[in-house]
C-alpha cells in the first residue's frame, strides 16, 4: 500500500517550506492541490515537476475513491492546499478519512498553519483554546455565533477580510466581544 502525505505549504512566505516537504513533493507519484494555478507557482519555485491534479471542495467527494484505489495499488500521493495545512478549513479531511478507513497510512508533515502563530502572537491565553474555522456566511450564521456565547476559552476564527468588521459587530451584539475580552486580528 502507498502513503498519503498531508503536506503543509507556506502561508505567505516561501521560506517556511520545509526541506522534508520539498522532498516528499518531489518523490510523490502525484500531488493533489486545492488550486493547481496557485500550487504550480509553489512547485515551480522549488523545481518540483510531479503530476499536479486538482483536489478541492467541489470534487473531493467524487475523486477520493479513485485516489484511495491508487494508494491501495502502492502509489505515494501528496496533498497540499493553497496555504497552510490541508484539512484545516481546507479540503483534505474527507480524503484523509477515506484513506484511513481503507487502512492506508496517512502521514501529516508538521509545518505552516495560520492559526497557531496568530494565537501565540495575540497576547491572549493560548494554553486552552478552541478553533472554530470559517464562520458560516449566511445560513445559520447568527445561531452559530450565539451558540458560542458561553465559551470561555480563547476562540480562533478564520474570516474573509471583507467580512471582519461585520463579524466583529455581530460578536459584540451577542456579547462574545466585550471590553474584558480583547479581539486581536491577525
Language model regions located:
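Glycine-rich, flexible N-terminal cofactor/catalytic loop recognition
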Residues: 1-58
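Short glycine-rich anion-binding loops that position phosphate/pyrophosphate groups of nucleotides
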Residues: 11-13, 82-86, 161-163, 181
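Glycine-rich, highly charged phosphate/nucleotide-binding loops
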Residues: 59-67
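Glycine/small-residue-rich loop that forms an oxyanion/phosphate-binding "nest" at active or ligand-binding sites
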Residues: 67-113
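Class I SAM-dependent methyltransferase SAM-binding "motif I" and its flanking Rossmann-like core
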Residues: 94-151
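ATP/pyrophosphate-binding catalytic subdomain of soluble kinases
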Residues: 140-173, 177
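Single conserved hydrophobic/aromatic residue that forms the stacking wall/gate
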Residues: 174-186
Amino acid at each position: 500500500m502507498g502513503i498519503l502525505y498531508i503536506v503543509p505549504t507556506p502561508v505567505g512566505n516561501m521560506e517556511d517550506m520545509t526541506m522534508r516537504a520539498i522532498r516528499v513533493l518531489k518523490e510523490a507519484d502525484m500531488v493533489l492541490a486545492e488550486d493547481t494555478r496557485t500550487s504550480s507557482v509553489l512547485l515551480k519555485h522549488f523545481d518540483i515537476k510531479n503530476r499536479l491534479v486538482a483536489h478541492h471542495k467541489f470534487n473531493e467527494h467524487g475523486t477520493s475513491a479513485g485516489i484511495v484505489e491508487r494508494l491501495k495499488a502502492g502509489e505515494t500521493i501528496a496533498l497540499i492546499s493553497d496555504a497552510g495545512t490541508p484539512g484545516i478549513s481546507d479540503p483534505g479531511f474527507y480524503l484523509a478519512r477515506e484513506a484511513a478507513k481503507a487502512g492506508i497510512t496517512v502521514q501529516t508533515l508538521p509545518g505552516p498553519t495560520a492559526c497557531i502563530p496568530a494565537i501565540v502572537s495575540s497576547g491572549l491565553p493560548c494554553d486552552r483554546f478552541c478553533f472554530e474555522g470559517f464562520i458560516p456566511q449566511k445560513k445559520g450564521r447568527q445561531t452559530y455565533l450565539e451558540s458560542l456565547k458561553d465559551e470561555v476559552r480563547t476562540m480562533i476564527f478564520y474570516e474573509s477580510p471583507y467580512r471582519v468588521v461585520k463579524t466583529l459587530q455581530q460578536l459584540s451584539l451577542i456579547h462574545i466581544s466585550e471590553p474584558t475580552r480583547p479581539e486581536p486580528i491577525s
